[in-house]
Regions:
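Sec/Tat signal peptide C-region and signal peptidase I cleavage site
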Residues: 18-22
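Bacterial N-terminal signal peptides that target proteins for export
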Residues: 1-8
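OB-fold single-stranded nucleic acid-binding module
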Residues: 23-124
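Bacterial N-terminal signal peptides
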Residues: 8-17
Length: 124
C-alpha cells in the first residue's frame, strides 16, 4: 500500500512538470495577443511609459515595442504596488525587459499586471 501511494505521488509530480513549464513560455510583445488567458513571459523594449497619478488606482503603464497610442502590449503597475518598483516610468524606460504573469486584455491591448518587482527582469 505504501508503495502505491509513493508511485501515485511520483506520477502526479512528473505529470505536472510539463504543464508548469508550458505555462511560462517566453514570447514577444507582438505574440501576446495570441496568448490571452495564458501565463507567459513577455519580452520587449519599453517604448513609452506613463504614471497616471491623478487617475483612479494611480496606474503606471509600460508599453513594449510600440509607444502609446499604438501600443501592442502593456505592463500595468497599480499605485498600491508602485512602492515595490521605485519610479518604474523612469527606471524601465527604453530598456529591454521581460515580464511574467497572466496575459489579459484592456480595450483590446494585451497586458500583464505586475504586482511584484520580481515579475519584471531587465535584459541588457
Amino acid at each position: 500500500m505504501k508503495g502505491l501511494r509513493c508511485l501515485a505521488v511520483l506520477t502526479i509530480f512528473f505529470l505536472t512538470i510539463p504543464c508548469v513549464h508550458a505555462q511560462t513560455k517566453k514570447i514577444t510583445a507582438a505574440e501576446a495577443k495570441d496568448h490571452i488567458g495564458d501565463r507567459a513571459t513577455v519580452c520587449g523594449k519599453v517604448a513609452s511609459t506613463h504614471y497616471a497619478k491623478n487617475s483612479k488606482g494611480e496606474p503606471t503603464f509600460l508599453n513594449l515595442d510600440e509607444p502609446y497610442p499604438k501600443e501592442i502590449f502593456t505592463i500595468l503597475i497599480w499605485g498600491s504596488d508602485r512602492g515595490k518598483f521605485g519610479t518604474p516610468e523612469s527606471e524601465y524606460k527604453s530598456l529591454q525587459v521581460c515580464v511574467t504573469g497572466k496575459i489579459t486584455t484592456y480595450r483590446g491591448v494585451p497586458e500583464i499586471v505586475a504586482n511584484e518587482r520580481e515579475q519584471i527582469e531587465i535584459h541588457k
